[in-house]
Swiss-Prot record:
Gene3D superfamilies tied to this protein: 3.40.50.1400
Subcellular location as annotated: Cytoplasm
Protein's organism: Chromobacterium violaceum (strain ATCC 12472 / DSM 30191 / JCM 1249 / CCUG 213 / NBRC 12614 / NCIMB 9131 / NCTC 9757 / MK)
Name the UniProt record assigns to this protein: Ferrochelatase
Residues that coordinate or bind Fe cation: 213, 294
Pfam families according to UniProt: Ferrochelatase
HAMAP family xref list: Ferrochelatase (MF_00323)
Enzyme Commission number(s): 4.98.1.1
Annotated InterPro entries: Ferrochelatase (IPR001015), Ferrochelatase_AS (IPR019772), Ferrochelatase_C (IPR033644), Ferrochelatase_N (IPR033659)
Free-text function comment from the UniProt entry: Catalyzes the ferrous insertion into protoporphyrin IX.
One Gene Ontology biological process: heme biosynthetic process
Biochemical pathway: Porphyrin-containing compound metabolism; protoheme biosynthesis; protoheme from protoporphyrin-IX: step 1/1
TM helices/strands, residue ranges: none
Molecular functions (GO terms): ferrochelatase activity; metal ion binding
Length: 364
């Protein structure tokens, strides 16, 4: 059966109160830490041409013939190790961030807003949340991917999906996007404060590892600014913490496949620090605003094991910003700046519009 050209939308009415929407978009998570739940999630994720840039036919054969028959079970074990009674950490943190953001914006005097969150892969989907926002009367929409550093495989694909959904609306809202916030002063200050807070409970480390999610190296060579933006975030964070160049290192994690990715690899950095008998290492992941599999399992568990098993001393993982009040305040500042000129929509405007329309014979 052919898919309808347009999505179902509420009937147009002159008397509805128009709102401005803010949609936070994160990567996503499976519905459960099981192989059954991981298979459709991984299929959606790894079928994205923004994520895997190789010819479609050979990749389809590899994905469906090999990866989806082996990786779901392996990944399920990793997810199970971080899953909480309430569910996926990433989902919980993103949901809380949206709720806290709405409250913070309200304290700034921005009340006529619909603030929500969606996932690029998995649930809640971008399509379902944009549909809900349209039902709430959203006619101006700010899309904010929760990736501080722009990359085609993260920020761009989130916006791709949002635009795909918007292209299927008859009554399309005005749209703005937040491309990145890697050098936003509030974001950097929140990161620095999070690290200083951690250091209050113990000695400063001999080395601070700033671990960012990796991407294939060829993407940098083809114009993706991600590597540069990670380096700038790291430099600004080091300056805020007054660190010398020998006191920190910027590295990249989560390599997938055999292609060369951005270097140095976090796993190799931790191994080398262990072999050097480094007494204390702290790891922070500035590219993630909410703790997830890549931070809680790959770094806090696997990274720790790598460092200790190669002779390292004390390993400490510094949590992501999550629900930190300073981070929520800085996020609200980013939103407010990008909503400039949009928040003047008033309920009275819709009432006046409806009255005038009815005078001219409108029935709704």
């Amino acid at each position: 059966m052919a898919m309808p050209r347009y999505l179902t939308e509420p009937a147009f009415r002159h008397d509805y109160a128009p709102k401005t929407g803010v949609l936070l978009i994160n990567l996503g998570t499976p519905d459960a830490p099981t192989a059954q739940a991981l298979r459709p999630y991984l299929k959606q994720f790894l079928s994205d041409p923004r994520v895997i840039e190789i010819p479609r036919l050979p990749w389809w054969l590899i994905l469906n013939g090999i990866i989806l028959n082996t990786r779901p079970k392996q990944s399920a074990k990793k997810y199970a190790s971080i899953w909480t009674k309430e569910g996926s950490p990433l989902l919980l943190h993103t949901r809380s961030q949206a709720k806290l953001l709405k409250g913070q914006l309200g304290e700034m005097g921005l009340h006529n807003l619909a603030v929500d969150y969606a996932m690029r892969y998995g649930n809640p989907s971008i399509e379902s949340v944009i549909g809900k926002m349209r039902e709430q009367g959203v006619e101006r929409l700010l899309l904010l991917p929760l990736y501080p550093q722009y990359a085609a495989s993260s920020s761009a694909t989130a916006l791709d999906e949002a635009f795909r959904v918007l292209s299927r609306l008859r009554n399309m809202p005005e749209v703005r996007t937040v491309r990145h916030f890697h050098d936003d002063p509030g974001y950097i200050a929140a990161l620095a404060a999070q690290i200083r807070k951690h250091w209050q409970y113990g000695q400063r480390p001999d080395k601070l590892v700033m671990s960012f999610h990796g991407v294939p190296r060829f993407t940098r060579d083809k114009g993706d600014p991600y590597h540069c933006e990670c380096q700038k975030t790291g430099r600004l964070l080091a300056e805020a913490l007054q660190l010398r160049p020998d006191q920190y290192v910027i590295s990249f994690q989560s390599r997938f496949g055999r292609t060369e990715w951005l270097k140095p690899y976090t796993s190799e950095v931790l191994e080398a620090l262990g072999k050097a008998k480094t007494a204390r290492v702290d790891v922070v992941c500035p590219g993630f605003v909410g703790d997830c599999l890549e931070t809680l399992e790959e770094i806090a568990m696997e990274g720790k094991e790598t460092f200790l098993s190669h002779g390292g001393g004390e390993f400490r993982y510094i949590p992501c910003l999550n629900e930190d009040p300073q981070w929520i305040s800085s996020l609200a500042g980013i939103v407010r700046n990008n909503l400039a000129g949009w928040t003047e929509i008033r309920a009275e405007d819709s009432q006046q519009r409806a009255a005038l329309a009815h005078d001219m014979g409108a029935s709704a």
